[in-house]
């Protein structure tokens, strides 16, 4: 009996060793973290999936090394992704805890381990979409919820050494020096003034356009960097033309400028770059985002009042 069962156990172990991991990203930042995580598990096989509601040059750039890339704009594509990604996995990695498609993929798949990583500032914001009471829109059609993904993750890779995190402290693994730049800025004394975009409203684009246009003019910025999911166009500004997220685009700016002055409304860039040499990051005070800005202040980020000249 011992010799008869041995091949069965061996086959089972071989199957386990051949099981792949699924890692899902939905933003350029998530894609950058996903690639980092894949390198940590370099001996393991990954299926890398990129899902986005908006496809643009930046999304294309950061998804270029992914096995499957989906622009999910309708129900048919949603079902295609769900059917194609529902499999048996060793580990499933995700960042967007309340993404309906991720909830449904996890609910329908078989897996041994759930792992997660940061989606950005939302992970450490006590009044954010991952910390507030569960909303019906954060429940998948198979019953899996945002809170299930948060509570059931075994390990969470984070950028932030914060006293609050939506994932339990003992599960956190810190990504040290994640945004460290391997470049020496040019020595010419020049400063680039940059404004980062913000999606103020999901329903009314004119709110975002008015805010951004007003402050871009008041600050007389050299460059404007749109939000990753931005669909609107801002007139009378010079766009920083690059497929890179701003943290990576600094490499290009430092070829022409010795210093970079960054303005934002509530961007997590303020956390990522606050200790970067030759970079000054300033938040623009707006009552619209009072709570979020106060939390960023608590995290050590600076905010300033910008005179509009009205």
Task: Give residue spans per PLM region.
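Well-ordered, non-membrane alpha-helical segments in soluble/globular domains
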Residues: 35, 78-80, 99-108, 205-219, ...
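Donor nucleotide-activated moiety binding/catalytic core segment of transferases
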Residues: 75-82, 228-276, 292-293
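Catalytic binding pocket for nucleotide-activated donors in carbohydrate/polymer assembly enzymes
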Residues: 269-310
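A nucleotide-sugar donor-handling region in carbohydrate enzymes
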Residues: 117-119, 124-192
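Short, Lys/Arg-enriched N-terminal segments with co-localized hydrophobic residues
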Residues: 4-18
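Active-site and donor-binding regions of nucleotide-sugar-utilizing enzymes
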Residues: 5, 22-143, 269-271
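Conserved catalytic-core segment of nucleotide-activated headgroup transferases in glycan assembly
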Residues: 192-230
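Short, hydrophobic beta-strand segments that form beta-sheet elements in well-ordered domains
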Residues: 23, 46-52, 92-95, 114-116, ...
């Amino acid at each position: 009996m011992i010799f008869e069962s041995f091949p069965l156990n061996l086959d089972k172990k071989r199957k386990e060793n051949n099981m792949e991991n699924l890692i899902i990203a939905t933003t350029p930042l998530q894609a950058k973290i996903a690639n980092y995580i894949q390198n940590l598990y370099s001996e393991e096989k990954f299926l890398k999936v990129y899902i986005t509601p908006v496809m643009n040059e930046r999304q294309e750039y950061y998804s270029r090394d992914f096995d499957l890339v989906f622009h999910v704009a309708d129900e048919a594509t949603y079902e295609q992704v769900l059917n194609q990604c529902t499999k048996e996995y060793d580990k499933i990695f995700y960042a967007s805890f309340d993404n309906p498609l991720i909830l449904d993929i996890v609910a329908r798949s078989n897996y041994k381990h759930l792992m997660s990583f940061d989606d950005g500032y939302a992970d450490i914001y006590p009044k954010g979409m991952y910390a507030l009471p569960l909303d019906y829109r954060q429940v998948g059609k198979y019953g899996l919820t945002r809170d299930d993904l948060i509570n059931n993750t075994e390990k969470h890779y984070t950028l932030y050494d914060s006293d609050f995190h939506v994932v339990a402290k003992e599960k956190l693994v810190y990504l040290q020096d994640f945004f460290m730049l391997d470049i020496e800025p040019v020595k010419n004394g020049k400063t680039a003034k940059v404004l980062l975009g913000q999606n103020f409203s999901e329903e009314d684009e004119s709110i975002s356009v008015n805010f951004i246009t007003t402050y871009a003019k008041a600050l007389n910025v050299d460059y404007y960097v749109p939000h990753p999911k931005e669909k609107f166009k801002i007139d009378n500004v010079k766009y920083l033309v690059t497929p890179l997220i701003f943290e990576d685009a600094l490499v290009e700016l430092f070829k022409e400028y010795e210093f970079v002055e960054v303005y934002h409304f509530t961007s997590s860039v303020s956390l990522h770059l606050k200790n970067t040499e030759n970079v000054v990051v300033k938040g623009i005070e707006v009552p619209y985002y009072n709570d979020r800005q106060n939390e960023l202040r608590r995290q050590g980020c600076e905010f300033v009042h910008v005179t509009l000249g009205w």
